[in-house]
Amino acid sequence: VKINNELSAPVASTVGVPQGSVLGPILFNCVMSVLPKLLRDFGVGCHTYADDTQFWVSFDEAGDFNNEATARWRISQAFGIISKFMLENHLKLNPKKTQFIPFSRKTDAIDFAPLALSSDVSISPSSEVRNLGLIMDSKLNFHAYVSDLRRNCFFHLKRLKAIRCFIPQGQFATLVHAFITSRLDFCNSVFYRLPDNLISRIQTVQNSCAKCLTGKKKYDSATQARIELHWLPIRARASFKILVFAHKVVHQSDNAPAYLSSAFSTTKHSRITRFNCDNTLKGFFTCRLSTVGARS
């Protein structure tokens, strides 16, 4: 371990490292990096984040028994691959933390039976799952996530209001950003296409924070408070984040993900146009129907 210019004495590691060691997360990621390739070779999509592993199987026509049976078989085989992989690497699969959720259109109702992980362990389909802090439901309407977000934000705002008179304004603003607005900005790209009734519920949280920071009263204008703080409304804030991210991807910025940058291709016109730019994007496909899959 090297900190600044100081280097610790070398220690031989034959099996693993003590829990809490700085090498623990790195070595764990090295071991788990093999798992996504094993699942993708089997035709199952997968991605990992630290100790959180997610895999999925997609199929068409929810009412088709053959497609559904094939998907269930592939999921069961994927669980077998994961169990075998963990057994070989001295790890243990925790059935209590293992969940699966079927996603479908609002018009298609999928009634999945419990999946068997082993001869004595099975898991039932969940209506809601937490994906790295984001609560996802089977219809992707995010009602549960909005309710959970409001509950947590107002809980912290109530506690911060109790100590506001003891903290300078600058430090109080830092606490509000750390405990509340950071939650509003987390995964706020999903707010872009939410209906107005859900956006208004999230907007009340931002309005309360703005009034608290500017010293406004309950019935004062929240718009004026946001203007004083240079805050965009929730929907505009989500749009701005998406536009900034898209600009980085299109212009091949250093911190733009390569898997997204490679999906965009530019073209050059054969004649001079009013908009003469080297970064003109090629046209993308258009959707005839406004379905969930098309909007994504």
What would you call each of these model-derived segments?
Residues 1-296:
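Hydrophobic/basic alpha-helical segments
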